[in-house]
């Protein structure tokens, strides 16, 4: 039997999804209506939040992911688990087991800290919709800390819109780069974007090598999951060798 379990959505998207669910006679479990989540605190080790539903009493949980939106993602996961267990006639997982599982969550490339000194954070935000909550999380977690953003994206993404978003982040500087991939912007295209927005353009390998040796600010590497698939192993390898 099909089911529909949804997070908070724009009204139009919600209507479409719930309309399809009704057509397919799929029971609907919806954020706010059937379960609620409230962020309690954000730490460098994750998020603390309260969760309540018709199936569970209100309780606090912690998820080992940065970004305030991850509390909602964790709440959605709890709801899915509870609906599936109930459908199969199984006893719901205890609060302690759920909390233990959330403590062990790892999501490479999603506000992932890959170096502590200097602090380097990776996030695959690759469109304006994803950049907005990332910026909100950075403002919340690092309100007064100086930040450097190393950014690139692939050709199918909204480069101009994301550049404007990043330039609005306080206490930060934006640096552009590109990478070897047929989907990536060319060196010339990135140079043109850097010139238009009066930004620095760098070779990412050289930049990261220098940063690991001399960097003293928070560095966020972002813009493309394809880009991070090259950056992440590079950083982890050099971090391990150091």
Give names to the regions the model predicted.
Residues 1-5:
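Short, small-residue-biased leader/transition segments that mark boundaries at the very start
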Residues 7-10, 124-125, 151-155, 178-180, ...:
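Structural motif
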Residues 10-29, 45, 119-120, 128, ...:
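C-terminal helical cap/extension that packs against the catalytic core
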Residues 33-42:
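A conserved short coil-to-beta-strand element within the FAD-binding core of flavoproteins
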Residues 41, 132-133, 159-163, 186-187, ...:
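Short, well-ordered secondary-structure micro-motifs
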Residues 52-173:
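Nucleotide phosphate-binding/pyrophosphate-handling subdomain across enzymes
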Residues 76, 216-225:
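Short SAM/SAH-binding signature in class I
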Residues 225, 230-242:
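Glycine/aspartate-rich loop-and-adjacent alpha/beta segment that forms the canonical ThDP
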